[in-house]
Amino acid sequence: SLILSILLYMADSYQNSDMTNVGCEECKLKENKVFSNPGAPVYQCTGCCFSRAYPTPLQSKKAMLVPKNITSEATCCVAKEGERVVVDNIKLTNHTECWCNTCYHHKS
């Protein structure tokens, strides 16, 4: 009876916990140790944002060369603001603010 109670409690706790971002931190600034120098830190945006999938609207589906039933949409952790800096003769963008927005590497 005690073991059953413990198992039920664990199952209930697991069900109510937010498992959407396990293993991935929120989108935020993090110091880049490779390019940072003492007194001159360089930051970059890292972390996770949402993605979702939904049924493709009929109007959109008709316009597709290869119709797909499911459409997915994702956002990535990208720099909202940044300033150009030079570190060891390498031009970099030091991120100053992050947000979840269009994934640039998905654009063609």
From Swiss-Prot:
Location relative to the cell: Secreted
Keyword annotations from UniProtKB, A to Z: Disulfide bond, Glycoprotein, Hormone, Secreted, Signal
Record-linked SUPFAM superfamilies: Cystine-knot cytokines
Disulfide bonding pattern of the chain: C24-C48, C27-C77, C45-C98, C49-C100, C76-C103
InterPro entries tied to this protein: Cystine-knot_cytokine, Glyco_hormone
Glycosylation sites: N69, N94
Main localisation: secreted
One GO BP: thyroid hormone generation
First and last residue of the signal peptide: 1-13
GO cellular component: extracellular space; follicle-stimulating hormone complex
Gene3D superfamilies hit by this protein: Cystine-knot cytokines
Keyword Endoplasmic reticulum: no
GO molecular function: follicle-stimulating hormone activity
Family listed: Belongs to the glycoprotein hormones subunit alpha family.
Subunit structure: Heterodimer of an alpha and a beta chain.
Protein's job: Involved in gametogenesis and steroidogenesis.
Protein's name according to its UniProt entry: Glycoprotein hormones alpha chain 1
Lineage summary: Eukaryota, Metazoa, Chordata, Craniata, Vertebrata
